[in-house]
Structure formats: C-alpha cells, structure tokens
C-alpha cells in the first residue's frame, strides 16, 4: 500500500492480509510544508499501518535520497534519512527497506534515488547516511543489525 487513497477502507482490507506494509515517500523540503509537518504526517501514516493489524508493519520502500516522480524532488538534507528511518522504527516498523539499492541502468527509474549511485561510490552521502550512519544508530538497539559493522567498520 502507499499513502492514503479515498475509497479504500484500510481496516476492512487489514482483515484479509497477514502483514501490513507500505511504501513511504514523504516529500521532504517542499515549499508549502515544514520538515516538522512532513514528519508529523508521516508519523500518522506509520501509526495507521501499525494499528491496522495491531502489530509491527513492514516499510517496503523508501528513498535514501530523492524520487524521480514527485512535484518537488530535492536531495534529502543531511540527517533526514536517519530521522526518517528511526521515526519508522519508533512507530512500530519491523523493517526499513530502500528502493532502490543500486541506481537503475535505464528505463523509468534511472533517475530515482539509490543507496549506491551510478558511479558505485561508497563515499556518497546516501550510502554513508543510509548504511553506515544509520547502521551505527541501529546497532545500539538491535543486536542482529551488527552485520553492518562488517561493511562500515567499527
């Protein structure tokens, strides 16, 4: 599922599914809304998906940097990727998954943000913030996430 759509009774649909999940693509840094307003709206959506089943939900897709389809599609400012991921977990998610891991070589999503860009560099900000910095935060709370220290170092 993705955001709110009129005509869909999410709680009725929740009775038919095993796990609630959604794709989260907030429009950070848009001129008509503060970062705080975007965060509050996103928090409400996380709470909606948690409450659908009364248990943790899966965040199936989120962008580590920007999208290729929103009216305003700016690179996330430093710290926003971490804020967004930690907010997701704080509101009951069992996962924070990114679309896409590696930038597409062609087609419609070639210019959609990715953890690893077209140049494959590990020193790019989306890679550092979504894998290394965020992993450091998660490693404090989730022992199973310690695998990330093998990639980013201690």
For the regions a protein language model found, what residue spans apply to each?
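Distinct, well-ordered alpha-helical segments
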Residues: 3-14
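A Trp-anchored, charged/polar loop motif used as the substrate-binding/catalytic surface
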Residues: 2-4, 134-135
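Carbohydrate-binding surfaces of carbohydrate-active enzymes
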Residues: 14-18, 22-154
